[in-house]
Amino acid sequence: VPDLPVASARPASVRLLADQAFSRAAGAPLVGGNAVRVLRNAAEHFPAWHDAIRAATRSILFESYIIEHDAVGASFRDALVEKARSGVRVRVLYDWLGSPGKLGRGFWKPLAAAGGEVRAFNPPRFDSPLGWLSRDHRKSIVVDGALGYVTGLCVSAAWLGDPLRGREPWRDTGVEIRGPAVADVERAFAQVWSIAGPPIPDAERTEAASIAPAGATAVRVIADAPSAAGLFRVDQLIAALARSRLWLTDAYFVPMAPYVEALRSAARDGVDVRVLVPGASDIAILSPLSRSGYRSLLEAGVRVFEWNGTMLHAKTAVADGRWARVGSTNLNVASLISNYELDVAIEDERVAQRLEECYADDLEHATEIVLLRKRRHVAATPVAPEREPAVRRAMAGSAGRAAAGALRLGGAVGEALTQPRELATGEGRILVVAAAGLALFGVVAFRWPHVVSWPAAAIGAWFAAAFLLRAFRSWRQARRARPEGSIRWVRSSAA
């Protein structure tokens, strides 16, 4: 936890209250006795993952939002197949929407034949028309219940870059964890695994008490589920408690209004608040959406930087050189409210200072966005004059990120419509796009009403059938579960 302002003579009790507040906000306890190593980019992640898989003797849990059918994906599949053949229990979980079309039908057959298990999270279901909105965006690996990885990287060659085509590696961050907190990472995997099918047997689960301490670092594993918003609450607490600096990195930055206000308030109080985001996103529409929110941050004193490389995919925060966060959660409504996400909050000066060093290095390859005071326009000021922003797309966004982008578009348009201030150029473009889309929809609906009415009728019938089916299943389950002598509510006639 960042340094707390203590007005009384009982700092220990204040610290206890702070720990309680963070535990309640995150829905996760603070676990001590861990060793944490910061990993940068695929060049450090992928070799570490392969080494861990090769060293496994009992179990491997492998979870990723995206697993590409490319050289990187095949290398990990083959490594898992080899361990499964040797008797190691291997379980792989990937998101159905994050990886459609990326995995051929036969991609996982060798692993299944070797005795491994593979599950796709949340494929479409007839009785849940909107269920696809909740995705498993987590990226984690647990080996033998004693070694864990939590990161922002997916399994794809895009993170390695392509020197022949002039594409730099994607910038990303994760951590390697040894110690009792690994049990919480395993528990997070087991939670989503049980949603996708039968649960992991209790006999195969690892208890934190059975893991020997590996260091002195305290870790909080924040396993967010739809509507839980644990990380959102934690980040707001950190913004309120930070005293000197709060440095954020985010890949798809369209934050909700309460968090924007928390950052603005911290900056007004003199906290050095910085936000580092991609200059060029793998989702083309996202950059103007992110930029539409810069002005309110800049006017409050928040410093905003855009990464000049191919793609910045990291999701990190570091406060006061004492507290750090690393994981899969982006600062937008899709990640904070609708997805299954996994992050670790780390209370350790060594780890926090290492992330601050990484942040300072990243700013050497970034462009600062500033306000031109004369007309209050947003402009770019190079931080590293030897480098110009690289505006190119490394690869097309996945279907899952495209769906999340639609949610972000709605949020950004709402902000632009409701803010009582002059619109920036980026915001004006968003409104033009929204207006053009609505106008086109209106013309089509007026000229060819059947083009709109028929799909609407089909969707309405689908929703109605799905709701009736779920209601029937719920009623049937309730009847089966009702024991003899169960309590029933009756209206009392007494005054």
How would you describe each model-predicted region?
Residues 484-494:
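Membrane-cytosol interface motif
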Residues 462-482:
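Membrane-helix interfacial anchor on the cytosolic side
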Residues 1-439, 493-495:
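Charged, low-complexity intrinsically disordered terminal segments
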Residues 391, 395, 448-452, 472:
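Structural motif marking the loop-to-transmembrane transition
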Residues 441-458:
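Membrane-interfacial hairpin junctions
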Residues 321, 436, 440-443, 479-484:
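Contiguous, function-dense segments enriched for cysteine-driven chemistry
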Residues 431-434, 455-462:
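Hydrophobic alpha-helical transmembrane segments of polytopic
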